[in-house]
Regions:
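Arg/Lys-rich amphipathic alpha helix in sigma70-family domain 2
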Residues: 76-77, 91-111
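Structural recognition of an alpha-helix C-terminal capping motif at a helix-to-coil junction
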Residues: 48, 62-69, 83-95
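N-terminal module of bacterial RNA polymerase sigma factors
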Residues: 1-45
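Sigma70-family region 2
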Residues: 27-28, 52-55, 68-82, 103-105
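Amphipathic, Lys/Arg- and hydrophobic-enriched alpha-helical face
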Residues: 39-57, 74
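Solvent-exposed, non-membrane alpha-helical residues enriched in polar/charged side chains
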Residues: 23-24, 36, 47, 51, ...
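Alpha-helix N-cap/helix-initiation sites
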Residues: 32, 36, 57-61, 82
């Protein structure tokens, strides 16, 4: 995304209110524009989190994309009363990183006697 929304968090309550508007627009109408705004706010932050966990630029890019796809698909079930969007998104990110590590772990092959 060329546009950065990093400063949105400096506005306090207005930022949270705007974020909730975007979430409702996605939940109710599948708003692509709202999804782009929401991704724009969190993309760099989530990418850095994943990169620190994986140490790989390629893996971080792939996982970050996967995280946002999963988040957008799961957004109809998101409830702000249970957790902030940021907390919810980080839980998805952490789970995706754990899943990737499990898949990357070598599978032991039983030793056969000759």
């Amino acid at each position: 995304m060329a546009r950065s929304y990093a400063n949105i968090f400096l506005k306090g309550g207005e930022a949270v209110e705007q974020e909730q508007k975007w979430i409702r627009a996605i939940q109710r109408h599948g708003s692509r524009e709202a999804a782009e705004h929401l991704i724009g706010v969190y993309y760099d932050e989530i990418y850095r989190f994943v990169y620190r966990q994986t140490g790989s630029r390629e893996d971080a890019l792939d996982l970050t994309q996967s995280i946002f796809i999963a988040a957008l698909r799961s957004l109809p079930g998101y409830r702000a009363v249970k957790a902030s969007f940021r907390t919810w998104l980080y839980r998805i990110a952490a789970n995706k990183v754990i899943d990737a590590r499990r898949r990357a772990r070598p599978v032991p092959v039983p030793w056969e006697e000759a």
